């Protein structure tokens, strides 16, 4: 069963696996703490098996140094549903840090935000995408306080030539960040005078969570 699950598209999405020219897989994630198996970056099955084994351990793993069930909670919920894992057989874990974070976000819906191109910056010619986590009973005014999930390049050089080469070839590392929406709205709308388009996504409560 585990072998078949390692071939599932959702498992590949969770681990950011992409097919390689040689017929294998390699994850786009570079953080060593993102993988539980030594060869997890290139072996979906090994990572799956080690992930399942880690659920039965109290060892602290990952960048956040938490038990595997809490550090990789999306993997856990998917595998629990697919394998019918009995939680009573696992070491008890409350995942307080995750639940406190989720309570702060208080997600009720997700909106896709598209700031259009910024003419003074060629690197923005295709615009940008980010997600806004909207809360229940949110108004037009309070939506500015909602959190966003953003992925962007970690620009390490202000040299124009280096910036252009690394930007076009994917030479910069990418990172996720979470900020209140008013910060991004001010950056894109007020400072750069971009048009900002919003698209409410049709997601189920489980997908939103």
Model-assigned labels for residue ranges:
Residues 185-209:
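Active-site nucleophile-His-acid catalytic modules used for acyl/amide transfer and hydrolysis
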Residues 87-92, 128-129, 141, 204-209:
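Structured, non-membrane catalytic/scaffold regions adjacent to prosthetic-group chemistry
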Residues 1-39:
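Intrinsically disordered, low-structural-confidence terminal and linker regions
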Residues 108-194:
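Glycine-rich catalytic cores of cysteine/serine-nucleophile enzymes that process amide/ester linkages
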Residues 24-26, 46, 184-187, 206:
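Short, compositionally biased low-complexity segments
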């Amino acid at each position: 069963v585990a072998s078949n699950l390692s071939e599932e598209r959702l498992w590949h999405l969770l681990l950011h696996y992409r097919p390689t020219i040689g017929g294998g897989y390699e994850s786009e994630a570079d953080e060593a703490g993102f993988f539980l198996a030594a060869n997890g970056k290139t072996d979906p099955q090994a990572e799956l098996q080690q992930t399942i084994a880690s659920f039965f351990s109290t060892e602290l793993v990952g960048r956040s140094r938490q038990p595997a069930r809490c550090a990789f909670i999306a993997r856990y919920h998917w595998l629990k549903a697919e394998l019918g894992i009995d939680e009573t057989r696992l070491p008890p874990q409350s995942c307080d840090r995750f639940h406190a974070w989720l309570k702060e976000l208080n997600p009720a819906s997700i909106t896709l935000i598209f700031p259009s191109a910024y003419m003074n910056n060629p690197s923005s010619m295709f615009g940008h995408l980010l997600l806004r986590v909207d809360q229940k009973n949110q108004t037009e005014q309070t939506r500015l306080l909602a959190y966003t999930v953003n992925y962007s390049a970690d620009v390490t050089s202000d040299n124009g030539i280096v910036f252009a080469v690394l930007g076009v070839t994917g030479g910069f590392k990418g990172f996720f960040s979470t900020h209140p929406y008013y910060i991004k709205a001010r950056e894109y709308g007020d400072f750069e005078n971009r048009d900002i388009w919003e698209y409410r996504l049709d997601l189920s409560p489980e997908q939103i969570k």
